[in-house]
Each structure stands twice: as structure tokens, then as C-alpha cells.
Amino acid sequence: MFGVPSAMHTMSFRVPTDLSESAAEDLLRSSVAGGHDRAPTATRTDLRDGHLVLSRELGESGPVYVPWPVPRAGRLVTPTTTLMFRDRPYELVGELARGKVNQVRNQYADWLSGGLAPAPDVDAALTRATHVFGSALLEESADAADRQADESLAIAHEAADRLIRRYEDQVFQLRHQRQPKLDTALGCRLAAVPPKGIDDAFRLAFNAACMPLTWRSIEPTESSYRWAEADAAVNWAVSRNLRVSAGPLIDFSTNGLPDYVLKLRGEPLSFKSLMCDYVETVVSRYRGKVSRWLITAGANGSDVLSIGEEDLIRLTAMAADAAWQIDSSLQLVFGLSQPWGDYLARSGFEYSPFVFADTLLRSGLPFAGVEVEWYLGTSPRGSYCRDLLGASQVLDLFGVLGVPVQVSLGYPSAAGPDAQSDPAEAVAGGGRWRDATAGAQADWAAAFASLALCKSYVSGVFWDHLTDATPHRVPHGGLIDARGQLKPAFDRLRALRETHLK
């Protein structure tokens, strides 16, 4: 069917005829999921004869994750229900609506059984979404059916947002009954001392600061270190009585590793020697000032060194061991990029983010937690945008690992070029949550930070970088723009700290 090799299992979806070119291109990022953690699997995607064709070697049924322009919500990855491979095409928009209604209904039922108070506004939205979906099924015209299904999908997303708000309100209320102000860290990464005039504002918004100390920025050439800005930033944070952490020391990306290290492709032993030397040097320098370290980030799904996944797990463990050799009392955390496992849709990867983390934790090393990157709306390091319900579910998945989880946040406030951002990272291709504007960034920051902070297993939430005027990863992702003006997101985070945290 559709010219796919016979060894592949195939399903197809009829695509609306009026879909924009960019939305059609994003459909090629779709994937079929599998496994107990419902992570994406290697999926071949094609658009032919008005159909999205998905093929893979594994013939088991599974949900399909599809980037889709959801009315009033943005361009978001949206799940279907579990679908089987078959010759007859599915109706794409109808399956997305069915999948979202099902996802919201199931999560609502789970939380109700766990003690969540019924929410009439959620009930009403689900009823409306179901009614509109039923109307779509009865339409004889394919175009009319698509319009109705799209509206059902939009209403289901609104129901999901209402459900998350009800869940957050009740969880915060219960937690504040025991503790008026929570101990959770809310911080921002600082590559240098904050700009003049920001000192007091920073301390009002955040109770913590994280210094990246990333290998590429500190030791750009072998044995030649740039300590001045890092020393000043660490001393500034210590003098302000902020909780001081650092990392990621080893970021497995072209923007995180020095050029002389990137040349060691396929040489894990040579890489390990240089890596451990760097970790020992940095940890020794800041011993007594920094007690919590994000030792690595982005090892899962990384191919920059042409090193296999098992070697990357071993290298993460070796980096941690090098730090513990300096101080066995250190709290060490390792980071996970693309927590939904977007990279698994490409061939060459087997370990989902959850399996990668679980494997490391089962090694017996006393890690103090894991960090999950919620860098949404950028590509290739970031994840394609999800809604709050999808974010809550993936965070709860990592919560079952039994160690504290910290969350790193980043979302762009604009879509154009950013001279100081990682040249490999772009807003194009990452979807969008409502929009890529300063106002949308502020709403995103408040919504996603609040969701993370309400979870009892979350130990800290950190914004990716403070200012767009210095080198950074997420394009336009700072809380201060390149001209030195505070963005609205800064005040939204300050309000969260004031309401909920010490």
C-alpha cells in the first residue's frame, strides 16, 4: 500500500485538503508509540495522495503522536487512541479529536478516584466536545466533518486546561495546609552576574540560582580556563543567600562540548579522560560554595560523538564518580532532554528518556535526582510543543522513579533570528503554545512553572537563562531581552514565588 516495503506495517490517515504547507511539513514528525511508557518508536512518515502514511517494522498497535494546529491552542503534538495497522485509511482529524477526548476523560477519572473534587466546568466541556465529535461522525461531507472534529479537538484541549487548573488549585491548597510556604527551589541559570538594577528583582523572583559552568564555555581550548564570569556569578549568589547549584557541566551537544572534544567522535575512552579531568577541576574549584550539581544533560538522544547509548550511560556514571571522588557528600543530578522521547522517532535510538534514567538509577549510584528539560517550541534540542496535560503526564512518569525531579524551563518570546542563541537551535519546527510572543511566553512560564511546582516530588524549577544579551540555548528564551528590558514572564514567575514559596 502506498509503495511501502512489504516488511513494514502501515497505517494511513486522510489529511484535510486545506492544510497549510508548514502544517503538512510538521506532519512528517508524527510517530507511532509503543512500550510501557508509550514513547515514540522509529517511524517512517510520508505524505502521498492526500494521506499521511506511517510505517514501522513493529506490528503492534499503539497511539499515534501527531503535530497539529489546534484551534485556539497552538500547534501541539496531539495523541490518538490506540490504533492498529490496517489497509483502510483513518480520518486524521477525527482520530485526533477522539484521542484527546479520551485522554482528558481518562485523566479526569484517575484524579477523581484519587480525591480530586468534581469540576462542573470540566464536565461541561467534555460533554460539549463529545457532542461535537458525534456531529462530525454524522457529516457526509469530508470537509464539514473535519471542521467539526477540529472544533471538538479544540474544546477537548480547553477541557484539559480546566482540568489542570482544578488539579493545581486543589494540590496547592492541600500542600499549603501543611506548609504555608513550600521549600521548592525556583531559580534561573546565570552565566554571569545579573545586569545592574536587577539584583533586588532577581531575589524577589527566585530563591535559587544555577551557574551553568558548561565545558564549552569554561574550557573552550584544552587546559585554558575562563573563570572570571563564573567566579563572580557564584560569589554573587552566595553573598545573596540564594541556594546555589551548578550545571550542566557536561552537555552532550555541539553547543555544550568544546570543539577539540567534538573531534573525538567514536572515541569514548579519550572523551572519558578529558571529561573526568574537567569535572574534577570545576568541582574542586567551587567545593564549599556549590553542593548540588547537574553533572550531565542531553546524553539521552545524543549522537554528536557517534557513541552508543550504553556508552553514554557509562560516561554519565563516570562523570558523577569523578565528582564524588572530590567530595562524596555532593548532591548530583543528571539531566534528560526531550522527555517525551521525540528523538526516538528517528532510527538509531532504543532507550526512551524514562528507560535511560531508570537504567542509570538501577546502577546503584546515589544520584540525588533527575532533571527534565521542558524546552518547548524549539528544535532540534527542544521538544515539539505539548499542552499542560501532556506535560503533567510525562512529569508524573518520571515521578515514579523514586527520586526528586527538577525541571528546566524554556520557551521563546519571538520567532525571528537571535544572534546570541545556539546557532543550531531554531524556533521553526518546534510548534507553538498559542504563539511565540512576549505575552505568550509569560502565560507559558506561569502555567508550566506552576504545574511543576505543585508536584510534591519536584525539588526545583529553573528557567533556562536570564538574559538574551549573553550566549544561550533557547532563542529569545530569556526573562530579559537583548536591550535589557524585563519581559512579562519575569513578573509572572515572581508572583508564583510570592504566592507559594519561601
What are these regions (language model features)?
Residues 182-190, 292-295, 315-351, 372, ...:
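Aromatic-lined carbohydrate-recognition surfaces of secreted/lumenal glycan-active proteins
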Residues 203-216, 221, 286-297, 301, ...:
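Aromatic- and acid-rich polysaccharide-binding/catalytic face
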Residues 2-29, 65-130:
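Amphipathic, heptad-repeat alpha-helical segments
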Residues 131, 135-201:
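Long amphipathic alpha-helical scaffold segments
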Residues 285, 299, 304-318, 322, ...:
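Aromatic-rich peripheral "rim/lid" segments of glycoside hydrolase catalytic domains that contact
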Residues 3-27, 171-208, 212:
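Boundary/entry segment of secreted carbohydrate-active catalytic domains
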Residues 190-203, 230, 272-283, 347-360, ...:
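Short, acidic/polar
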Residues 208-220, 231-341, 412-419:
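Substrate-binding cleft and catalytic face of glycoside hydrolase catalytic domains
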